[in-house]
């Protein structure tokens, strides 16, 4: 069983055990894909999010290396199938894991109180999703602290 946690920080668990990533960029790449909920992310878009101030050719080369490291790392845990790579884009297969973010936005009552106002705080790009989550929390539970 794969569980992806996005509230109060991004982490991935397999059968209740925290998995480790080969680098912070590999972890962030997976976080971006989880945030996109199965939609594909182009190489250019991922490059911008992970390497905003790096020359494009260098950034794209770095990204390819990061993807392969991420895939190899996930293979060690037997969960590499969550990654989907097509020419020039990346995605995740959302059917293969449970995610607090997904369950929360779908209104699953077991996840309604897990959101405490923090969503992947280690990534600046995740801030854009916070207002949406806070509004949902208010809808489900009343006022957010």
PLM feature segments, named:
Residues 1-145:
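Intrinsically disordered, low-complexity protein-interaction/activation regions
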């Amino acid at each position: 069983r794969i569980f992806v946690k996005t509230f109060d920080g991004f982490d991935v668990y397999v059968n209740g055990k925290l998995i480790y990533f080969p680098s912070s960029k590999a972890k962030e790449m997976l976080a971006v894909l989880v945030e996109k909920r199965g939609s594909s992310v182009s190489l250019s878009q991922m490059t911008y999010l992970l390497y905003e101030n790096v020359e494009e050719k260098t950034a794209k080369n770095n990204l390819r290396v990061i993807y392969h490291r991420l895939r190899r790392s996930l293979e060690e845990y037997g969960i590499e199938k969550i990654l989907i790579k097509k020419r020039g884009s990346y995605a995740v297969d959302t059917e293969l894991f449970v995610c607090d973010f997904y369950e929360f936005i779908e209104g699953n009552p077991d996840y309604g109180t897990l959101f405490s106002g923090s969503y992947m705080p280690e990534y600046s790009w995740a801030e854009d999703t916070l207002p949406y989550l806070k509004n949902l929390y208010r809808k489900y539970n009343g006022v957010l602290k």
